[in-house]
């Protein structure tokens, strides 16, 4: 059997189907809640996808927001991604010492769980003249492991 060497030969039908299903569910939820259609942000977690799949999602299917959950994975494929019109969000646990590696690559960080991490993000973002949106994790249930 001949090995596939280009994205032209590779089928991404599963991505078309999955995205259509997710968008339909989002539209139904918007309708049920009374929100205007298209006002909900679709953030595609791409942790197990390869760069061809991600580029297909963003450049062919129009997904504009992708979420990475590992610093090393983000760094290893960052240059191969077609980032035209795409915002990358960091959605995984982030150690303070790794902020410097992603601060110029992400639109937001969704996992800020300590003041020291927030301060490091602020310091690194200011150094390059950027503002980074952050989402703060709050342990409202006083659970010890959160």
For the regions a protein language model found, what residue spans apply to each?
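Conserved alpha/beta-domain cores
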Residues: 1-146
């Amino acid at each position: 059997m001949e090995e596939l060497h280009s994205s032209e030969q590779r089928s991404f039908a599963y991505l078309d189907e999955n995205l259509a299903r997710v968008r339909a569910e989002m539209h139904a939820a918007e309708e049920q809640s009374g929100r205007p259609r298209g006002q909900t942000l679709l953030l595609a977690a791409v942790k197990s996808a390869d760069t061809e799949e991600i580029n297909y999602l963003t450049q062919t299917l129009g997904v504009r927001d992708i979420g990475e959950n590992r610093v090393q994975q983000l760094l290893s494929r960052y240059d191969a991604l077609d980032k035209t019109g795409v915002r990358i969000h960091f959605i995984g646990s982030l150690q303070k010492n790794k902020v410097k590696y992603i601060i110029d690559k992400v639109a937001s960080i969704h996992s800020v769980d300590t003041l020291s991490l927030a301060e490091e993000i602020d310091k690194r973002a200011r150094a390059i003249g950027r503002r980074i949106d952050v989402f703060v994790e709050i342990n409202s249930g006083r659970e010890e492991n959160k």
